[in-house]
């Protein structure tokens, strides 16, 4: 998993509440267990028309936001089913941070496991970030994880809270496998000792 230290990028405003995981990645994309290639399916029912052409009115199809790294979203983002394909699709599209007032619990946890930083802010701060994001090509935010701070294009800041363990994992690029590998020396030592003491096993 890639480390998350400081992220600077365009923020796309998605002013929709209760965005569920089925909207993030529809069911027809769940047949694969590969994490790559799902970016095309991200918000596909909003991004594409019935004939397969792009919907020019959807935010991620607008030229200013095609390369967005940050998503500023309405309340209760990621509610619904537990599909881990939702954060996979966001990550494959290029989004590494989602900012909202609240998240679906399972989606929130899955984000951390996949290197995405979900940030909870107050409604007042979200409204301010929506204003920043609506600047289009000038909608650049900086996410400073070490200092738990969002910096806007005018230099304004928004502080955020994050669990210390999850912060450690993101800063060091540690997923579940990475955390296990941190203890490799202790695991090897235990296995060597077990082989000596229970050679019969």
UniProtKB/Swiss-Prot annotation:
One of its GO terms (biological process) is L-leucine biosynthetic process. Keywords: Amino-acid biosynthesis, Branched-chain amino acid biosynthesis, Leucine biosynthesis, Lyase. The keyword Lyase applies. The keyword Cytoplasm does not apply. Pathway: Amino-acid biosynthesis; L-leucine biosynthesis; L-leucine from 3-methyl-2-oxobutanoate: step 2/4. InterPro entries: 3-IsopropMal_deHydase_ssu, Aconitase/3IPM_dehydase_swvl, AconitaseA/IPMdHydase_ssu_swvl, IPMI_Swivel, LeuD. It catalyses: (2R,3S)-3-isopropylmalate = (2S)-2-isopropylmalate. It comes from the Bacteria. It is an enzyme of class 4 (lyase). GO terms for molecular function: 3-isopropylmalate dehydratase activity. Its EC number is 4.2.1.33. One of its GO terms (cellular component) is 3-isopropylmalate dehydratase complex. Pfam families: Aconitase_C. PANTHER family: 3-ISOPROPYLMALATE DEHYDRATASE SMALL SUBUNIT (PTHR43345:SF5), 3-ISOPROPYLMALATE DEHYDRATASE SMALL SUBUNIT 2-RELATED-RELATED (PTHR43345). Belongs to the LeuD family. LeuD type 1 subfamily. Catalyzes the isomerization between 2-isopropylmalate and 3-isopropylmalate, via the formation of 2-isopropylmaleate. NCBIfam families: leuD, PRK01641.1. Heterodimer of LeuC and LeuD. This is 3-isopropylmalate dehydratase small subunit. It comes from Nitrobacter winogradskyi (strain ATCC 25391 / DSM 10237 / CIP 104748 / NCIMB 11846 / Nb-255). The gene is leuD.
